[in-house]
Design a protein with these regions (language model features):
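Conserved "repeat-terminator" motif of extracellular CCP/Sushi domains
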Residues: 136-140, 233-243, 252-264, 350-356
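Structured interaction patches on ligand/partner-binding surfaces of diverse proteins
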Residues: 128-129, 204-242, 317-356
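Intrinsically disordered, low-complexity segments enriched in Gly and acidic/Ser/Thr residues
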Residues: 291-307, 313, 318
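Structural motif
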Residues: 148-158, 258-263, 267-278
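C-terminal motif of bacterial Sec signal peptides marking the signal peptidase cleavage site
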Residues: 21-24
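A short, solvent-exposed beta-strand micro-motif common in secreted/extracellular proteins
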Residues: 108, 195-206, 307-318
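Bacterial N-terminal signal peptides that target proteins for export
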Residues: 2-15
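Acidic, low-complexity Ser/Thr/Gly/Pro-rich repeat segments typical of extracellular/periplasmic
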Residues: 26-191, 196-200, 213-219, 225, ...
Length: 365
């Protein structure tokens, strides 16, 4: 009787072990346990390692450093420049097998982009896009467009179209490239061909979003060309819409009504190749101060609340004391502006005189 009981116990334990083993093999998942994961997934490598001389419909393997959330892939993979592509992929835990589209042109570098919708299995999203170039050519296109985004914004996207387009076309035609610049104030497009481009910065991007209803910024001209090489200092300024500015202004006025507020003063001088009238803006997330710069380049700002600020000057072409970022309804593009290279810390009851600020406008490309 005792022997039968021991045999039954052994069989039960063996059965439990086999059930656990097969259950663990039934689905693709990473080992459990360890510290809480709060680090976004990272790209390890691709196979082939360098995706040149690629053939249409060729299979490539993309390996990450951890297991991914399979459900996040659907809205996370895009190919640029934009088009109707018949690619497909297969999820394999920390790897993705991807079969490239059949309709690939020979003379352009494409990009597989994993956007910030991509998550690992612990629901941790990417903080910035992962970009993987591939081409049917032996080398990648090497031209770049880069710059900075200034102002007060929660998110930022840079949109790029082939050719010099009218503004009504930009409103109604999807961009050829989209770059999510939300995690940084700088941006850079890589692997671009030697073509002409139109460019726009927006706070929000999506297929159903009207660019005119959200903060946007044109560049100061509509003719960007990479035919003579790469471009840098293609800078934008995103600021709140008028309704949002009015709400902030009311809050600021309430704050300034308090008694015995001690303030700071900022003075200095600018010089360079600019056209008057030229204005000055000192700004942080809570406060903004502005004034005209005198003909001799001197300026003064009074009544500044203590804090850290960003300083910029701009050519006020239409003399309305506003840094205009262009319009979809007129031929106006963004006004030229320059940002002081360092942030300024102002203390109450202090006067800060900054060194003479000299800047020069390079020849337009």
């Amino acid at each position: 009787m005792e022997r039968m009981f021991l045999n039954l116990l052994r069989n039960s334990i063996s059965l439990i072990i086999w059930v656990v083993f097969f259950a663990s093999c039934a689905s693709v998942s990473s080992p459990q346990g360890g510290d809480i994961d709060d680090i976004p997934p990272e790209l390890n490598e691709t196979s082939p390692k360098i995706l040149t001389d690629i053939k249409p419909t060729q299979k490539i393997t993309i390996e990450f450093n951890e297991y991914l959330d399979e459900s996040s892939l659907k809205n996370a993979i895009t190919i640029f420049p934009s088009g109707e592509y018949d690619f497909r992929y297969e999820y394999r835990g920390d790897k993705i097998d991807l079969w490239l589209p059949s309709n690939l042109e020979k003379d352009i570098t494409y990009m597989i982009v994993f956007n910030t919708n991509l998550k690992d299995e612990h629901n941790v999203r990417l903080k910035k896009d992962i970009i993987i170039p591939f081409s049917r050519k032996a080398v990648f296109d090497s031209n770049t467009i880069q710059g900075n985004i200034f102002g007060d914004f929660n998110s930022a996207f840079i949109l790029l179209w082939f050719n010099h387009l009218d503004k009504d076309v930009i409103l109604n035609q999807p961009p050829d490239y989209v770059l999510n610049a939300s995690s940084n104030s700088s941006y850079k497009f890589n692997f671009l061909p030697k073509k002409d481009f139109s460019i726009l910065a927006v706070e929000q991007y999506g297929s159903n979003i009207n660019y005119e209803e959200k903060p946007f910024s044109f560049y100061r001209k509509n003719q960007l060309s990479l035919k003579d090489g790469s471009l840098d200092n293609i800078n934008f300024y995103l600021h709140k819409m008028k309704s949002e500015e009015n709400e902030d202004s009311e809050e600021k006025n309430d704050t300034n009504d308090e008694k015995n507020i001690k303030t700071a003063t900022l003075t200095g001088e600018v010089s360079g190749n600019f056209i008057h009238p030229i204005s000055l803006i000192l700004k942080n997330k809570k406060n903004e101060y502005s004034n005209m710069i005198q003909l001799d380049g001197s300026y003064i700002l009074d009544g500044i609340l203590e804090g850290k600020y960003q300083l910029l000057v701009y050519e006020d072409r239409n003399n309305n004391s506003v840094l205009d970022m262009g319009s979809f309804t007129t031929n106006q593009f963004a006004e030229r502006f320059f940002v002081y290279p360092d942030s300024l810390s102002l203390r109450a009851n202090w006067e800060l005189e900054i060194p003479k600020w000299n800047y020069n406008i390079r020849e337009d490309k």
